[in-house]
Amino acid sequence: MKRGKRYLENLKLYDKTQQYSSDEAMDIVLKTANAKFDETIDLAVRLGVDPRHADQQVRGTVILPHGTGKTVKVLVFAKGEKAKEAEAAGADYVGAEELVEKIQKENWFDYDVVIATPDMMGVVGRLGKLLGPKGLMPNPKSGTVTFEVEKAVKEAKAGKIEYRIDKAGIIHVPIGKKSFGKEKLLENFRTVMDAIIKSKPAAAKGQYIKSVVLSSTMGPGVKVNPARIFE
């Protein structure tokens, strides 16, 4: 794969074989995030679990103290008082069957989070094949199937993110933008890592955190020593 000149220049700024403390790694990531736009800072964590086993799944939600830097559009499936509550809380789209039809007919996905009240799941369930692959299907585990509509909308808007292990045993999450600066990004990073560590399945054997890599949208990956996540 051919790499651009900027990418190759960035590789000279650090030793890519070395594992750094999170503090040192963030310095390098910010130094190499030199594109002309506000790059997203991403985290990839490889875990010592086998995602093929139901008792070794790792997923959860966490509210980033400084948000993701992204404007989050929220769609809520609710009726009556709960629909009014969603609108008052700042939901971008609120509706019922008519929104299900819109999604089915128009392949409409102009939103980042979908919340539904439990009584709407019979209707929303018809969207499983459309919303599921995009990670948008409301789910009680992530707090998006709930009667506490106001709380769910406000948390989504505040930067609540869901993390889940993929088939390769890796969790990928964005932790903010370059413009946040080092301290805020480190706080977001450590908040996510703390949540992932606390999500360790009882069935997981051996080393749980195998590798931690920080990168910017256009920059190379920088390894964090799993023993120095909070340094």
From Swiss-Prot:
GO cellular-component term (any): large ribosomal subunit
One Pfam family recorded for the sequence: Ribosomal_L1
Spans through the membrane: none
Keyword NAD in record: no
UniProt GO MF annotations: rRNA binding; structural constituent of ribosome; tRNA binding
Keywords, comma-separated and alphabetical: Repressor, Ribonucleoprotein, Ribosomal protein, RNA-binding, rRNA-binding, Translation regulation, tRNA-binding
GO process terms (BP): regulation of translation; translation
Taxonomy, superkingdom: Bacteria
Task performed by this protein: Binds directly to 23S rRNA. The L1 stalk is quite mobile in the ribosome, and is involved in E site tRNA release. Protein L1 is also a translational repressor protein, it controls the translation of the L11 operon by binding to its mRNA.
Family: Belongs to the universal ribosomal protein uL1 family.
Quaternary structure, from the entry: Part of the 50S ribosomal subunit.
Protein name per UniProt: Large ribosomal subunit protein uL1
The organism of origin for this protein: Caldanaerobacter subterraneus subsp. tengcongensis (strain DSM 15242 / JCM 11007 / NBRC 100824 / MB4)
